[in-house]
Amino acid sequence: MFKKIISFLTAIFISILGINALNNEMELLDGDFGYILDEAAQTAIIKTIYIPNNEKKDLVVPKYVSFHGNNHLVIGILENAIRSKVHRIKSFMAREDFINSARNFHSLTWLIIFNIPIISVSPAT
């Protein structure tokens, strides 16, 4: 019971981080990348992001959502995923150095809590 309460509170905390991230304008950067594989929810995961010239861009990608961006954008994407039926998310794929970075740990915590596999991919050379 205690473990479920901790898991629930952690999920709420991460959701708040994600909402804050999506409310701020974010610069898209090359480097970090990943996929949230979700055939059922499809485009429900991500709604709108901001690109550097203040133009809003809706991301519509059938069957999966891919992203390139900084840590805040990743948190926002994960927050949207947790709000759109977590049980449908099959796995999360990201670059090895992204997953191993201490600064990204809090954005991956809820994946661990919900036993969603995190797949590590070596960076392209």
What are these regions (language model features)?
Residues F2-F98, H106, W110-T125:
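N-terminal capping/linker segments that flank leucine-rich repeat
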